[in-house]
Amino acid sequence: PMKFAYLIMAHNRFDILKLLLQDLDDARNDIFLHIDRKAEKYDEQELRMCIHSANLIILKPTPVYWGDYSQIQCILNLLKVSTQYAHHDFYHLLAGVEFPIKSQEYIYHFFEANQAYEFVGFNDDSKEYLERLKYFYFFRKYARYRNLWERFWGGIGYCLVPLQKFLGINRIKHCTTIFKKGYANWSISHPLACFLLQHEAEIRKRYRYTFCTDEVFIQTLVYQSDFYGKVYDPSDEYHSTMNLNTWEDPRNQYHMKDLPMLLKSDRLFAKKFDGDDAIELITKLKEQRL
């Protein structure tokens, strides 16, 4: 039988995270969970009590900052721990506020029928994202301006980008790599997971002090390799990852009104479920989904 590794990055909404863990509690699943070190207090025992059949491995918490290299490092850590733990047929990266809109049975059937593919999303809308790679983005971890100290360093980091533009700095000027971008979540095979880890030093060198490149580093490596020929749907980043995302809602959240659409969808995962009615929505979804 197939075996999955679910790699979960969480930082809030532990009520939703518990529902996610309960949903993934299947003997065929190994669940690798990283919780941001900056997260509010939570009860680890309560999380462990959600699991009876699967294996739950909670990684040592590190601070993860939005848009910062720490996001990439966290993904690599999850891949490292999960590939060393066991051989899995697929590694699924999920956020803590993401949820399967199909049952584990359905999801396993889908991947058994499609095990030749890599579920990585590509989007070629524009080359604007190259700005994220051209300059040094220092002090990204202070960009949320939580206090005076962060405001000071965050402000300096912010001012350094136009200065670099003025000075003509371009980190990728002589780089022959074709950079690609796409949806940040994916489902990948064991060989691709190992391939990414073999390139860890190169990833660090290239993407440290860049901005929001968790949507770039895997796509770029896959595009330059034979794995690109196995991508499920290179023309649609969400279909290729079997994910649903909402842009209609100002906070990109799903609500009760979206239930019929979620049930009708052929996708496997959706995000985000972190609105006021998220628990009610997930409960109804679980009752009625395939």
Predicted segments, located by residue:
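ER/Golgi luminal nucleotide-sugar-dependent glycosyltransferases, focusing on the catalytic module
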Residues: M2-L290
